[in-house]
Amino acid sequence: MSNDKGLEEIPEDQSTTPHKPTSNVGSRLTRLFQSTGQIETNYDEITDSFDAMELKPELLRGVYAYGFERPSAIQQRAIKPIIKGSDVIAQAQSGTGKTATFSISALQKLDPNVKGCQALILAPTRELAQQIQKVVVAIGDFMNITCHACIGGTAVREDMKALGEGPEVVVGTPGRVHDMIQRRVLKTDHLKQFILDEADEMLSRGFTEQIYDIFQLLPQSTQVVLLSATMPQDVLEVTTKFMRDPVRILVKKQELTLEGIKQFYIAVEKEEWKLDTLSDLYETVTITQAVIFCNTRRKVDWLTDKLTARDFTVSAMHGDMEQSQRDVIMKEFRSGSSRVLIATDLLARGIDVQQVSLVINYDLPANRENYIHRIGRGGRFGRKGVAINFVTADDVRMMREIEQFYSTQIEEMPMNVADLI
């Protein structure tokens, strides 16, 4: 959190004085952004494994239990500076792993001896706030912490009761959070971190005044972390007014991952016919290594059982499994002793296998951002790959959305697909 001099450390005895906005220390940043549309990264350090982040053992256990294998690009860059206490601006799209980035960082910085809100997370919508709460609770599963979602549309009395119990992490929407701080129900005396997720969305929804008011009610020493897909003028103003010498991290969208990957679809009239379609595909092509994605853990288990019953050798992996079990499966898959892996989206980003020649979306992903994480497996390291999507009548709209979003074309699978893999 910034003081008038912008870059100086704040003396301890000022830690409870409310925030005063700075002068426009970021005019150079603003000019640079206006010419490029992107912030300029000023931090290059990369930590490429969760083990190397020096996380608390119970937090590390939660990270692996949640299903993460290795950190995504933003997690490799942003977790360490946030943990060290720097103000951080991260420009990143959804689907890059940013929720886990600030959740892990916030959990690491919690003091177990202090009861009360130490991390406050703002989100533009109730749904996103609830989603973030679930991630924080899941990753913090072994840490004995509580996380409360403070959102509009719920009973104020219940909110007040939950906040009175002193949850260590509070995630909410600007209106309700501001109301609770003003009522002194949400106490900020112990607050260490203020995290704004999807800042561009929040400001475009007209929350600017409430966000500025919240800043005024926080201790001067509060660390500020801001995440935004775009950096319009109103977001830049927040960064220049309220942040002190921030670390700036730009994570570009992974556009290159679709290059060199042939994308096809097979029209499947009914959901029940997908299994036979997959069996036929097995007969047609010689698979070096393939990953098959389903949308639920239950579907992964069901498909594994069905294929095993038909004498196909497959491995399955999802977040319900113990980490040790998942490690064994990944080791077998990487070494090539297991050739077909059936998995959920949760693990899409952790599967880094060079030999994967084929990705099959048994289910199209529920959101278009996950498409690139699934398909990206096939074309990593400059290798060619093939992606085949099973598409029912209900999926056509999502497939068109994916094509539009990535400016790509998914064509009907040709008869000679075996020659392409």
From Swiss-Prot:
Domain of life: Eukaryota
Keyword RNA-binding: yes
Binding site for ATP: 92-99
EC main group: hydrolase
Region Disordered: start-end pairs: 1-26
Compositional bias ranges of the Polar residues kind: 13-26
Matching Gene3D superfamilies: P-loop containing nucleotide triphosphate hydrolases (3.40.50.300)
UniProt GO MF annotations: ATP binding; ATP hydrolysis activity; RNA binding; RNA helicase activity; translation initiation factor activity
Residue span of motif Q motif: 48-76
Motif DEAD box: positions: 197-200
A Pfam family reported for this protein in Swiss-Prot or TrEMBL: DEAD
Signal peptide start-end: none
Job description of the protein: ATP-dependent RNA helicase which is a subunit of the eIF4F complex involved in cap recognition and is required for mRNA binding to ribosome. In the current model of translation initiation, eIF4A unwinds RNA secondary structures in the 5'-UTR of mRNAs which is necessary to allow efficient binding of the small ribosomal subunit, and subsequent scanning for the initiator codon.
Domain statement: The Q motif is unique to and characteristic of the DEAD box family of RNA helicases and controls ATP binding and hydrolysis.
Self-association state and partner proteins as the record states: Component of the eIF4F complex, which composition varies with external and internal environmental conditions. It is composed of at least eIF4A, eIF4E and eIF4G.
UniProt-recorded name of the protein: ATP-dependent RNA helicase eIF4A
Species name: Aspergillus oryzae (strain ATCC 42149 / RIB 40) (Yellow koji mold)
Gene that encodes it: tif1
